[in-house]
């Protein structure tokens, strides 16, 4: 097949951008009207539509960034002597650990006081901006006639071999959050991950797909028929993208998890980072999250986005979603990651 000049040019540009890697972020960081926010992929949690709103409302351009939480923290550590990022969007356990490593600046800005105490660091090191519930995102057409699974244990049936996917628990926060959810549902605690490790050992025998980056598009395409993910992704897929997706809150139980933002220590454009955090916690920012099926941390879902709220599963289903001690979840994350990697050998 012969490429047109235009197609060749596109491929050449894509390759150049890929090879530039994190250097591209450094180029963006040089612009005073930009803020670098690590971990804001277009396909994840409404960021694709939020970034243009931030630009329109604040004048600050935030380029898309495809890192996951673990990769973001690793990059911040690597750049500690010459920071590139101004802020980061992280799973809560990664943010707690980032604070403990001295990687972030305290900031109590507009909207911070309105966030419930359990969803923000008392010193201002991080603040939750929205939350989601862990469950199963199921592409019903890709099941090839198999029944929609109702719980975690159903996926250990060999008939689902090769159909299940989850993000790498040792790197991506959603992978770790799903592991905590499985463990919680199957009788484990944050001091005993035995149930989750046993579960993943059994699931590993059925050829699961374990990517490191968001796998939203791969579930929509049917490549991953059953994905451990959040409710907000499943609802967006079904109601915004028109995909044959159902969200399942496992019968054994699950957890609800907040995502947070933090200001990077010695950020090159710290004021821009602060303004971005202020905006996502504003009424307009929280309304946007709610309209994208995320649980807001300031205001009520039903009031901010009544039409979106109607599309959630019934409240009785969400009664199976509990919470955990997020500080303890952060403390045991490294030990779990090491145990998980050992178990998968």
Features from the language model and the residues they span:
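Early extracytoplasmic/lumenal segment of secretory-pathway proteins
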Residues: 30-96
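A ligand-binding cleft/hinge motif common to bilobed small-molecule-binding domains
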Residues: 92-99, 220, 225-244
């Amino acid at each position: 097949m012969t490429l047109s000049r235009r197609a060749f040019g596109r491929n050449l540009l894509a390759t150049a951008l890929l090879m530039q890697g994190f250097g591209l972020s450094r180029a963006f960081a040089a612009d005073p009207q930009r803020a670098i926010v690590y971990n804001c992929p277009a396909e994840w949690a409404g960021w694709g539509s939020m970034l243009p709103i931030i630009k329109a409302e604040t004048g600050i351009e935030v380029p898309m960034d495809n890192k996951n939480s673990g990769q973001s923290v690793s990059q911040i550590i690597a750049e500690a002597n010459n920071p590139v990022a101004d802020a980061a969007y992280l799973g809560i356990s990664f943010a707690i650990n980032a604070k403990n490593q001295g990687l972030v600046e305290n900031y109590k800005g507009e909207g911070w006081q309105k966030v419930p105490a359990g969803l923000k660091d008392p010193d201002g090191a991080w603040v939750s901006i929205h939350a989601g519930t862990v469950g199963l995102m199921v592409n019903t057409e890709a099941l090839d006639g198999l029944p929609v699974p109702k719980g975690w244990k159903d996926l250990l049936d060999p008939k689902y071999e090769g159909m299940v996917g989850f993000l790498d628990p040792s790197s991506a926060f959603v992978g770790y959050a799903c592991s905590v959810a499985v463990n919680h549902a199957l009788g484990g605690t944050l001091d005993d991950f035995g149930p989750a490790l046993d579960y993943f050992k059994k699931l590993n025998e059925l050829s699961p797909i374990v990517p490191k980056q968001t796998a939203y598009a791969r579930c929509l395409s049917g490549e991953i028929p059953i994905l451990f993910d959040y409710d907000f992704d499943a609802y967006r897929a079904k109601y915004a993208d028109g995909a044959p997706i159902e969200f399942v809150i496992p019968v054994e139980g699950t957890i609800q998890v907040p995502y947070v933002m933090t200001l990077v220590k010695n950020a090159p454009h710290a004021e821009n980072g602060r303004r971005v955090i202020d905006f996502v916690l504003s009424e307009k920012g929280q309304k946007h999250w709610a309209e994208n099926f995320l649980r807001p941390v300031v205001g009520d879902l039903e009031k901010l986005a009544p039409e979106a709220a109607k599309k959630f599963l019934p409240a009785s289903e969400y009664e199976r979603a509990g919470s955990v001690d997020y500080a303890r979840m952060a403390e045991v994350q490294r030990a779990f990651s090491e145990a998980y990697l050992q178990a998968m050998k």
